[in-house]
Amino acid sequence: MKKRCSGILMPVSSLPGGYGIGSMGQAARDFVDFLVLAGQSVWQILPVGPTSYGDSPYQSCSAFAGNPYFIDLDQLAADGLLKPEDYAKENWGTNPNYCDYALLYQKRYKVLRKAYAAFLQQRPVPGYDTPYSDDWYRFTFLSDAWLPDYCLYMAIKEENKMCDWQTWPAPLRLRDPKALEEFRTGHADELGFWAFVQYEFAKQWQALKAYANSKGIKIMGDIPIYVAADSADAWAGRELFEMDSEGHPRRVAGCPPDYFAEDGQLWGNPLYDWAYHKRTNYAWWVRRVRHALSIYDILRIDHFRGFDTYWAIPAGDKNARGGKWEQGPGMDLFRALRTALGDLPIVAEDLGEIFDSVRALLAESGFPGMKVLQFSLNGTDSLDLPHNYPAHCVAYPGTHDNNTLRGWLENETTPAQRKQAKAYFALTEQEGEITGLLRGVLASPAELAIVTMADWLEKGSEARMNTPGNPAGNWQWRVAAKDLTPALARKIHEMSARYFRAEPLPEAEPKKEKAPAPQPKAKTADAKEEKTTAPAKKAAKSAK
């Protein structure tokens, strides 16, 4: 970032709306307008790929595809592909503050299939003018490197009751050319459906991004370093990963015990075969980052430290304690990316156990790292205390992996930590503890400060997005539209402007005093006399 600014972390899934989950529709545009009113410059989101078991956006079944749940149904209706009665009366959940992913899975695809049936009535045909011709063929052409394999993967997966691809019949699991061709021939309509879903996602996303950019808002996206074991990428590109001839991972990803989890984190993602990537000059990574930069303005790369050294866990282990550190590609990867793509607007998530070699890689890359206030209260002059933040970093009170500030203060801090927080941040009841902590982040030297929407709303643990190591109850929280008030936007704008992260609010013009209403003129004695004597004079004149 070239100047001090600030933004809000708000997952697309957490946007308000009536259909079970946030989408790329009017509520997203309303949130962009809220950001503008609040003087913000950046909208940070979580990964937008399709989710699967566990609902985690960091365990997507594709490194390139978009989440079908985010497709706005009202927009499909406006495009003539749905009727409001196709979806408006469906039960999308009983609690509008949380996503019910099981219900979404049961009902969303049925609605999207109705839209696809309408789309087929306007099927793009080369040489004919239809509403979708140009956009459809442009999309399928530009997505040719990943879309066919993704559609094939999803169609086969559905045919096999959504089971992991490693359990499919061997000819399909191991991509026998004859078996794949027979499947394509017999399931052409199903392949078309999955392509249609991705087309609609791309169309709506680009329209939303264009709207945000037109308002001066940059979108900071997020890509996980790894892909899921059960993904189109792993199935179609086994050579990219440490896998045996049957497609089973030899080792899997995770991280050692740390602040978040005493047993470490066993993610289960297949590890990259970095030797293969080096031989191909990181072509797959170039495609992946190019795609990400086509949908985001700024790119946060999760688990940056894994490019220096990564935690490799034997497949089959029950936790992450048995892993060991292995050497990653380092600057070799980022040099290849810069050669192919030019300047890289990347933010490095450099949290967790950080070695000197990771710090050296971050410095050589030139990417800003991250600082998190919730890691700071250890009784020392911690580098995570805001006065120690370098300018070239992104400052957070907490991330999606942390509790909210209120939940953290109430449930996770010790009396000593609360005492330190009160003294360091000069917390007062009048200002409020949460506002005081946010003040500390905004006042820091960091060029960019990002605050979660839940923290601006001063929510408790009920609004936490993710608890690492806990497989249930994550990624569900949603904001209520009524909470995004002009008063809150003004507070955010005032605090951001106070620390030169936003333009000052225009001063209210002083109220002009109303001029006193004109009073009727007082009647003079002469006027009264004139009025009194006038009838007498008239009578006298008549008598003559």
Label the predicted regions.
Residues 46, 218-220, 224, 298, ...:
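Outer-envelope exported proteins of Gram-negative bacteria
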Residues 510-544:
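Intrinsically disordered, polybasic Lys/Arg-rich low-complexity tracts
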Residues 1-38:
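Mature N-terminal, pre-catalytic/accessory segment of carbohydrate-active enzymes
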Residues 27-51, 295-296, 441:
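Catalytic domains of carbohydrate-active enzymes, especially glycoside hydrolases
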Residues 194-227:
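Conserved, well-ordered alpha-helix/loop/beta-strand core segments that scaffold catalytic motifs
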Residues 1-4, 11, 17, 54-198, ...:
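Alpha-amylase-like alpha-glycosidases and glucanotransferases acting on alpha-linked glucans and related
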